[in-house]
Swiss-Prot record:
Signal peptide: none annotated. ATP binds at residues 9-17. It comes from the Bacteria. It comes from Thermotoga petrophila (strain ATCC BAA-488 / DSM 13995 / JCM 10881 / RKU-1). InterPro entries: Cytidylate_kin (IPR003136), Cytidylate_kinase_dom (IPR011994), P-loop_NTPase (IPR027417). It catalyses: CMP + ATP = CDP + ADP; dCMP + ATP = dCDP + ADP. This is Cytidylate kinase. It holds the Pfam family Cytidylate_kin. Belongs to the cytidylate kinase family. Type 1 subfamily. GO terms for cellular component: cytosol. It is an enzyme of class 2 (transferase).
Amino acid sequence: MGFQIAIDGPAASGKSTVARLLAEKLGFDHLNTGATYRSVAVYLHERGFSPFSAEKEIENALKDLKIDYVNGRVYINGEDYTEKIQSPEAGVLASNFARLEVVRRHLVRIQREICDDKNIVVEGRDIGTVVLPNAHLKIFLTASLEARVERKLKEYQKRGLKVTKEEVERELISRDEQDSKRNVAPLKPAEDAVIIDTTSMSVEEVLDRILKLVRERMNT
């Protein structure tokens, strides 16, 4: 079994940036589980499904689904979905479909297969509690809503997306509510997770804190 690091937290808490850079520094693999949820949500939406579709129909649609996560890009049945999942709409779709047990069950199995026997940094919303409950190190990143809105707004603007600060705030509030109140695998820190508030921390400071924890765990 490899050394597994779980990084959870709400949208725009810094998970993706920290997880990617941490994996690079350690020479570990990296898995963004949110990208797998967004890809599957867009895939299902493209085929006319909604979160209110019959569970059996969704299950049949997922049965032969093959997901590959290679160098930060997500492929479904060989088709690159990476660009399709960058919009705010894809994030909302992911939160809606992620409430369905049939979707989570299917993706958790795939995510565990990807992580099996690897030194890996995995980011998401239920990694430490559901996907990798035995991870060697569990981190839960959090930040104020104001800080997260600013980060998400900059991210969208960098991609050339025209969104207002108010729209981003509404999106994050909605996603927070859906993620924390869903019946299946709600967003919450694992009991043994280290909680880090990144509101006033730089990326480098967060990385240094986690790297110190990694070294401590590896030496025990």
